A protein has these predicted regions:
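RecA-like P-loop NTPase motor core
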Residues: 2-87, 91
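Short glycine-/polar-rich loops that comprise or flank the Walker A/P-loop
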Residues: 24-25, 55-57, 96-99, 124-126
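Acidic beta-strand-to-loop metal/phosphate-binding motif
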Residues: 28-30, 93-109
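Acidic, metal-coordinating catalytic cores used for nucleic-acid/nucleotide bond scission
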Residues: 34, 69-72, 104-113
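A residue-level signal for conserved active-site and pocket-lining positions in enzyme catalytic cores
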Residues: 41, 102, 136
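Short loop/turn segments at strand-loop or loop-helix junctions that form parts
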Residues: 59-66, 103-106, 132-133
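Short, charge-rich binding segments
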Residues: 90-96, 118-121
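Activity-critical C-terminal alpha-helical subdomain
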Residues: 107-143
């Protein structure tokens, strides 16, 4: 008796049998503030599933140590970010794929426009999340 159905592989690709590599990117957040910004990004990480953030995207918050708590100047944030790029294995950071996000307020640069321009120029390779005048106002307007 003839087979009722003949199965073939006409609809499979040769790449279907090879190991699949899913896209994966890590975002490292470095914040100027030590209270509000840290709370916001911790909460964002906690509710990422409810927000529909792709599970293949890793969000990490780099918190400053006790000795670094007073180093909140955006120049210091850029130094921290550059240190990550110089020693990526220490932070499990892939310089070709992962991104660093620097979060700081612009309100302290109202009178220091040239310093602000220098900071923007020094941070070109990073993603900047600048709140103007401050992060707390951003939260009030968006929550």
């Amino acid at each position: 008796m003839a087979a009722m159905r003949i199965y073939s592989d006409w609809n499979t690709r040769s790449s279907d049998n090879s190991e699949q590599i899913d896209p994966y990117r890590k975002y490292l957040f470095i914040c100027e503030g030590e209270n509000t910004e840290v709370w916001y990004f911790r909460h964002l990480i906690e509710i990422r599933k409810e927000l529909g953030i792709n599970p293949l995207i890793d969000i990490q918050l780099l918190e400053r140590t006790e000795e670094d708590k007073t180093n909140s100047n955006p120049k210091k944030l850029i130094e921290y970010a550059n240190a990550i790029i110089r020693t990526p294995s220490k932070f499990n950071f892939d310089v070709n794929r992962d991104k660093i996000v620097l979060v700081f307020d612009a309100d302290i640069y109202q009178e220091k426009l040239e310093s602000y321009r220098r900071i923007l120029n020094d941070a070109k390779e990073f993603i900047l999340a600048i709140s103007n005048p401050c992060f707390e106002l951003f939260l009030l307007l968006h929550v």
